[in-house]
Amino acid sequence: MSQNNTISSMNPERAYNNVTLKNLTAFQLLSQRENICELLNLVESTERHNSIINPERQRMSLEEMKKMLDALKNERKK
């Protein structure tokens, strides 16, 4: 049996479940992390989402980055 036949006969779901950091997007990585936290009951479900993906912290970080970018643009113009 050739290697191609082996791959095609393999369950596609099983191949998809082979998760490494190289083949994950940021969203997938956070989703996997959230699933692990839920599985291990590391945080309660109400806290789980906010502890992993904290929207308020992300907004603050975005605003800080925008201010830094504007400062760098103004500095460059001088």
Swiss-Prot record:
Q: Name one GO cellular component term.
A: nucleus
Where located? Nucleus
Chain positions found as N-acetylserine: 2
Q: How does it assemble?
A: Interacts directly with RSC8. Component of the two forms of the RSC complex composed of at least either RSC1 or RSC2, and ARP7, ARP9, LDB7, NPL6, RSC3, RSC30, RSC4, RSC58, RSC6, RSC8, RSC9, SFH1, STH1, HTL1 and probably RTT102. The complexes interact with histone and histone variant components of centromeric chromatin. Component of a fungal-specific module (HTL1-LDB7-NPL6-RSC3-RSC30) within the RSC complex.
Is Iron among this UniProt entry's keywords? no
Which gene carries the instructions for this protein?
HTL1
Keyword annotations for this protein, in alphabetical order, are:
Acetylation, Cell cycle, Nucleus, Transcription, Transcription regulation
Please give the biological process terms from Gene Ontology that the record holds: chromatin remodeling; G2/M transition of mitotic cell cycle; nucleosome disassembly; transcription elongation by RNA polymerase II
- Role according to the record: Required for cell cycle progression through G2/M transition at temperatures higher than 33 degrees Celsius. Component of the chromatin structure-remodeling complex (RSC), which is involved in transcription regulation and nucleosome positioning. RSC is responsible for the transfer of a histone octamer from a nucleosome core particle to naked DNA. The reaction requires ATP and involves an activated RSC-nucleosome intermediate. Remodeling reaction also involves DNA translocation, DNA twist and conformational change.
Q: Which residues cross the membrane?
A: none
The organism is Saccharomyces cerevisiae (strain ATCC 204508 / S288c) (Baker's yeast)
What is this protein's record name? High temperature lethal protein 1
Q: Does the keyword Transcription apply?
A: yes
Could you share any additional remarks the record makes about this protein? Present with 3550 molecules/cell in log phase SD medium.
